[in-house]
Amino acid sequence: MRLTILHTNDIHGRVDGLARVATLVARIREETPRRVLYLDAGDVEETTNRLSNITKGAAMHRLLSAAGCDAATVGNAAWLRYGPQVIADHARVARYPLLLANLKPVEGVHDSVLLGNVGVIGVTASFAGYFGESISFGIEALPEIPLVRELARDLRQRGAELVVVLSHLGYEADEAPIDDKRLAHELDGQIDLVICAHSHHLLPGGDRIGGVVLASAGEYAQHLGRIEIDGDRIGVSVIPVPDETPPHPDVIAEAERIEPEVEAFLGETLGEVDRPLDGDWIADMLRERMAAEVGLAVAGQVLSGEPLPPGPVVRGPLWDVCDSSANPGVATISGERLRRMIEVGRSPAWIEERRRPLRGRTHERLHVSGLDPAQIDAGREYVVGATDYELESYGGLVERDWNLRPRYDFPIIVREAIEEHLRR
């Protein structure tokens, strides 16, 4: 077998970078007499990118299609934020098979694909055990090693001479039950190549575990991975993607087609507010929506910009200041724990803390609706409306061992809840 595989991972909404990558992919395809495949290992989407955020990642799959992608696996940037139903939306617009074998049930995806004599399997990080049961989306995570072993066997029987795992598990992920290095070790002799993502590693010369080669192209479309297969030999390298690389016209043209669709959607007037649409307003909205006694909203989580002034609310400005992908939820919380949450959420250290889910923003103040914190009765329970950020341990306000078991309004996210409130 003589084959060139080009690969990317963790592009995270870098449209300009993807357009430059597409130019290199097209150039290599033109210059290379052998067959060339372009594969992506997930997380092309990004909530802080305008086109990606507004379309819940679908625009990025249209652009990846324009870049000439042959197959991609599902990452975690979109479905963890918007719910797994968006994966089917991505699959509908993608002009390549979207692969995901280890999470079930998910619509629109394939466990594997046979591209000529190359078998490709897709797996992604399940985050099993990281989130509470209430945020599992009803998805079951299958054990990756026996699953990939069986899929590889099936692909071999169907004629695959090379078996590639497009993996969003992470090259090294000590805190996770499985990563790419452990996958390669366990499946030596059954798979040939793992293209890694999720951990954003750049492996200039790749890695080898037994007979399995691992490759990863870093992040943000700054590099294009290149794998040369010549018989039994597999060579790995990465190609820098200079800023001066001209963008591919097909990617730019697709972005220009998407923009008017987005602008028309964003121009709609949703309703009016008679006071600033700020953290207090959102805490009130969450309390009312979830039929709760108390509403909580972390300002830096629900708003990424200045509050909207009183008056008409247009979708575009609303979405500009509310890029949160958190889901409204409700939980019963003891007065003692609620008091602790408010104390933490209003402490100077917590207010100034920057957490990764907020993409570098500070928490700012915890807003409280429907209750004077000084009047909390430690001996009773309160029904609290908030979002998963306030009600799950990764937000920093609650402890994992509290076992709150919130109920969430999936797949609605904060800005959609605001829209529904304004339209009533």
Model-derived regions, located:
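Catalytic centers of hydrolytic enzymes
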Residues: 8, 14, 221-276, 283-289, ...
